[in-house]
Amino acid sequence: VGFKAGVKEYKLTYYTPEYETKDTDILAAFRVTPQPGVPPEEAGAAVAAESSTGTWTTVWTDGLTSLDRYKGRCYNIEPVPGETDQYICYVAYPLDLFEEGSVTNMFTSIVGNVFGFKALRALRLEDLRIPPAYIKTFQGPPHGIQVERDKLNKYGRPLLGCTIKPKLGLSAKNYGRACYECLRGGLDFTKDDENVNSQPFMRWRDRFLFCAEAIYKSQAETGEIKGHYLNATAGTCEEMIKRAVFARELGVPIVMHDYLTGGFTANTSLAHYCRDNGLLLHIHRAMHAVIDRQKNHGMHFRVLAKALRLSGGDHIHAGTVVGKLEGERDITLGFVDLLRDDFVEKDRSRGIYFTQDWVSLPGVIPVASGGIHVWHMPALTEIFGDDSVLQFGGGTLGHPWGNAPGAVANRVAVEACVQARNEGRDLAAEGNAIIREASKWSPELAAACEVWKELKFEFQAVDTLD
């Protein structure tokens, strides 16, 4: 009765340019590169179909449900400027397609099988609009920016961090010693590298103990609250939570997770534990470039950043704009706003395809890390502002006099930049002069300035705005 077997074009069902999006729809912007001979309407409709209710042929069970209620719809297609065969296809998904509070389920639908679809040469998810109705089903960050500042009693400046190097091979005691030197020199945080988990040369429990000792000793000496991102990432969720429990028992303020390699289910579980037990959660994005670096295939980091804000994390690495790792300024500032702000307007010049309302979900502090040193401090302070963590690994530990003087140099530099900014000086124009002035009364900063005066990482960004 009305069931007609066979294959029909996707666009007959899933391309609906007259559709008016609802406030409750999840909206997606895909960069679609169709195979030669496939019209953009068919390609866009195929994406909508394969990431929602469709399959390659008509099935009789379609008659048992309301397709109009549940299908994804490609409602707009724009050619990409300067490209002959690329299109931005906008797809609207009804909210009922997704399990509440599950980033895992959201991604399984939207970026699941469709990425292997033969009719497409390449496919990239550029942005998502998450509706308030769906956001409200997530806890989000365990604490958020304001609560973190209150817990740490640190206001009015960027926070300073340092990744302990060499990233692998140190014993737990030597590792703790390196943390202590950095913290007593003036840093707020030290950090486990993302691949430090629990290896034969340094088991996790030993590391946690010696790092806790470093935290308490440096706090006693400086009168400031200190932290070390203890990486709780593990082979199973149960083991990860066990490590977080031990961190809580030690009384340290913050733990860490590699959210892409660990997975969103594990990350959300850890974020819930952290909120329930007063731990801050630092998130590392190891593996992100596998997904987000190619311009025409994969998923843009702004989508991974939004997903993290839903899943939960208090800090996330967000590129530097000035260091050794990929990140164009306008694009980076676009997703930094999406991490921190309550409401972000659509702004294609910064890669933001949709207006996003976060309806009181706490913000995430962006972490700038990777190939940065004291000469970058004015630019970083200007670009990222106060609600950020500036992380100098080699830029602290590479100081010719050792870790503590390296930490002193960074602390003096950031305090000088904040003071200059507060006095109304232009950090972009006067940055080098500000650092030079400060180095006159800080021999540690002067030595750091000398070591890194010529160093630059200058390559063209791969992922640029159209």
From Swiss-Prot:
GO MF terms here are: magnesium ion binding; monooxygenase activity; ribulose-bisphosphate carboxylase activity
Cofactor binding note from Swiss-Prot or TrEMBL: Binds 1 Mg(2+) ion per subunit.
Protein name in UniProt: Ribulose bisphosphate carboxylase large chain
SUPFAM superfamilies recorded: RuBisCo, C-terminal domain (SSF51649), RuBisCO, large subunit, small (N-terminal) domain (SSF54966)
One example of a Gene Ontology biological process annotation: photorespiration
Q: Which residues are recorded as modified (N6,N6,N6-trimethyllysine)? A: 4
Oligomeric state and interaction partners are given as: Heterohexadecamer of 8 large chains and 8 small chains; disulfide-linked. The disulfide link is formed within the large subunit homodimers.
Subcellular location, in the record's words? Plastid, Chloroplast
* Active-site feature positions: 165 (proton acceptor), 284 (proton acceptor)
Q: Give the enzyme's main class according to its UniProt record, as a single word.
A: lyase
Q: Which GO terms describe its cellular component?
A: chloroplast
What keywords sit in the KW lines?
Calvin cycle, Carbon dioxide fixation, Chloroplast, Disulfide bond, Lyase, Magnesium, Metal-binding, Methylation, Monooxygenase, Oxidoreductase, Photorespiration, Photosynthesis, Plastid
Organism of origin is Aphelandra sinclairiana (Orange shrimp plant)
